[in-house]
Amino acid sequence: MQPEGLILVVAVGLDVRLQPAGPIGRKIFNNNYTGMHMSDALFSSLVAAPADPILGVTQRYRQDPRPQKVNLGVGAYMTDEGVTPVLDVVKEAETALAEACIPHSYLPISGLDGYGAHVQQMVFGADSEIVLSGRAATIQTLGGTGALKVGMDFMFHICGERVASTSLPTWGNHNAILGMAGYEIKPYRYYDASTNSLNFDAMVEDLKALPAKTLVVLHSCCHNPTGYDLNEEQWKVVIEICQKGGLTPFLDMAYQGFRDGLDEDATAIRMFAASGMSFLVATSFSKSFNLYNERIGALTVVCQSKTEADIVMTQLKAVVRCNYSNPPAHGAYIVERVLSDPQKYAHWKQELGGMRERIRSMRKALADEMARLGAKRDFSFVTRQAGMFSFTGLTPEQVEKLAVDYGIYAVKNGRICICGLNTRNVEYVAKSIAEVL
């Protein structure tokens, strides 16, 4: 006998239909599903999601048949030849892995054994009190995005934080992940479009106005998209505001090594560590190792004691288990081999330094060319920004004109990836920008 009120799913050949069970079920069916196919009932009201504002740029670029075109949208490092290189240290590690023929068994939920310890040493320094005391929990994640997702879910669902604050502007996925988790987002001002510079006074004012237990997302270096970073004195002010206001800092470190060097770029994080606060760090190795498709990152939660960190680790694993269960191994093996070997680590720092210097040279080349052309705006600010990106101040209309008339593709908000520039296209890009100003 069928229970009253059920709507049964019935397969008829290759067709799937809804069928009522009993009088109550028939009433529900007649009121809601009459004349509808099952797929109509489930998905017919959906509308297409908008294209990703960053990845959509690359899609448009690829569809452009013109031979002279430039992709300044996606944030990936490229050589002067326009390719994303495989680092020598990565080649060596992959060769060793192939020879070792390691079984493809599951990794632990927290990731590859030893990986977290070496990540902590890179982030905080090998002699850091945090590392030596064991009062931080580090878990391997699916890139930096995965670290943000796990950390934001942990703080919302486990720790009960309901308000988050991100810089205005910020990387778009910050707000998307926070919104999906359920946070109310209160942005803090960061960038002054009228002067194309950091607006620190406004940032301080907005941070001071945030309620206690607000998760504050901070860019530790190479701010995305503006390229403007805080100096040490400004970081001291931010740390004091977080301490007095009971705010929870979440530092996103996607570009360690791309501003001044691995240790130099960890300055802000090490200042937070010295303050004694509890905070979170998202680390990405996508850029620094050019391992974009391996999805290798880490989430670190700094606690007040080892006992507290051990408990936090159990909760982080619970978040991961009901999400993706456990992380992939290949990228972790590569990164762990390099971080754990002083000689390989030094080689990696050298290769990373080469990438950093190429980006700097392209910043200077763009600024110099804009000056030579006598552009309507002074573009010297590009050399004062750091990292892969420059916030150009171009309007959405100017960005669209670059794409349509010149085959130069950038993010709608005016962000360009400096890595897309090279010695063959920088003059063309500068000339095109000058013409749309």
What is each of the regions a protein language model found here?
Residues 95-96, 101-246, 256-258, 266-269, ...:
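Conserved core of the PLP fold type I
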Residues 37-111, 121, 322, 328, ...:
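N-terminal "arm"/small-domain region of PLP-dependent enzymes with the aminotransferase-like
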Residues 349-405:
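Conserved PLP-binding catalytic core of the aspartate aminotransferase-like
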Residues 313-331, 338-367:
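Structural signature of PLP-dependent enzymes
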Residues 23-37:
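Short, Lys/Arg-enriched N-terminal segments with co-localized hydrophobic residues
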Residues 268-311, 315:
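Active-site PLP attachment segment
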Residues 3, 20:
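Cationic, low-complexity basic patches in intrinsically disordered or flexible, solvent-exposed regions
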